[in-house]
């Protein structure tokens, strides 16, 4: 992975532009977190998935606003603890919740990259599901093609872990049927993405809804 350091620098250092959305009411503690259609938020999530999926020979994902809206609705329920509401989901939470817009973007970025860190636990010689690596396997599941995510701030006086980040995937990964993990979770054996590709995807107006 000769270009890993250069690519990682690009992925981390991409500028965060000022939020462009209009503030809209929703059923959460406040509205400081970026909305699910925010380009900075989408870019932070998608660059992480794009990079790691390329290394694991998985197809590029496209952003699905319907999945993102579903993730936002489920976060808005503000269950006491974060809960998987459906198959094909990855969740992260933070306490205390991020305090400003830029911190929410960083939360989404670091959580997305953090899911890949579970790869060190994954037994390639005995592929199967366990919670210890379930975020990683969903992230790189090869026939998953679409993703939508959201963040939200639940009332810290009513819930634990009020800062929440949910991603929903289609097709859902972590299928425990015989042979699925062997077929869908490959090691990091494919070539690094090029620096040029990373630069293109660092642009704020990059269209993640298309391959």
Spans of model-derived segments:
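A solvent-exposed, acidic/Ser-Thr-rich amphipathic alpha-helical stretch
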Residues: 85-111
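Fungal secretory targeting signals
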Residues: 1-24
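Solvent-exposed loop/turn segments at secondary-structure junctions
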Residues: 51-53, 68, 77-78, 96-98, ...
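Active-site rim elements
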Residues: 36-38, 57-58, 99-102, 127, ...
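Short, well-ordered surface patches within globular domains
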Residues: 33-89
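Fungal extracellular Ser/Thr-rich, low-complexity intrinsically disordered regions
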Residues: 17-35, 194, 199-211
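Disulfide-stabilized extracellular recognition modules
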Residues: 108-211
């Amino acid at each position: 992975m000769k270009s890993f350091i250069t690519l990682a620098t690009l992925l981390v250092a991409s500028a965060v532009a000022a939020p462009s959305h209009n503030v809209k009411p929703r059923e959460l503690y406040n509205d400081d977190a970026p909305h699910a259609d925010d380009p900075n938020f989408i870019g932070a999530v998608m660059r992480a998935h794009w990079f790691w999926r390329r290394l694991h020979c998985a197809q590029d994902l496209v952003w699905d606003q319907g999945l993102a809206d579903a993730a936002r609705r489920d976060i808005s329920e503000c269950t006491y603890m974060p809960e998987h509401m459906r198959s094909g989901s990855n969740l992260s939470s933070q306490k205390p919740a991020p305090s400003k817009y830029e911190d929410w973007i960083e939360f989404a970025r670091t959580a997305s990259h953090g899911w890949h860190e579970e790869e060190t636990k994954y037994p390639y010689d005995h592929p199967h599901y366990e919670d210890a690596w379930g975020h990683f396997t969903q992230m790189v599941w090869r026939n998953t093609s679409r993703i939508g995510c959201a963040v939200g701030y639940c009332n810290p006086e009513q819930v634990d872990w009020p800062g929440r980040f949910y991603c929903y995937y289609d097709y859902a990964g972590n299928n425990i049927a015989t042979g699925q993990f062997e077929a869908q979770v490959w090691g990091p054996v494919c070539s690094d993405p090029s620096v040029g590709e990373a630069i293109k995807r660092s642009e704020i107006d990059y269209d993640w809804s298309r391959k």
